[in-house]
Amino acid sequence: MKITTFFSIATLVTFSLGAFLFAQGVDIKEIMAKANKAGGLFPQIQKGLKAPAPNWANLKNDSDELVSLATMLGKSKPPKGDAASWATMSKGYLDEATALKTAIAAMNKAGADAAIGKLATSCTGCHKAHKN
């Protein structure tokens, strides 16, 4: 019962934060900082997956929030580059974040490792095309 309550509250907080940030018109730099900077969700998930016994509950919360941020990213306007490229690349990022979330929810370490590896390789192409 306590575990269910904890997960319910954690999920509510995650989605509330995502909704709040979206309502505030969060820009791409803020999304990227929350997701990828040192101490951000992506590095936390990477570190968590390297643990001998991953804390799947924490990883689930972090991956849920990463998917929320990836969703907001796709709805943002890039500082440069065309809209079609942005739509394709941001959808790819969202798809990989969702694959990571799915693997973590299934406590599938190999799947999560593969998904986070693919997610890590998505940065360069998008930054070349769309980052100032």
In which residue ranges do the predicted regions lie?
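Inter-heme linker and motif-flanking segments adjacent to c-type heme-binding CXXCH motifs
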Residues: 107, 129-132
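The canonical Cys-X-X-Cys-His
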Residues: 119-130
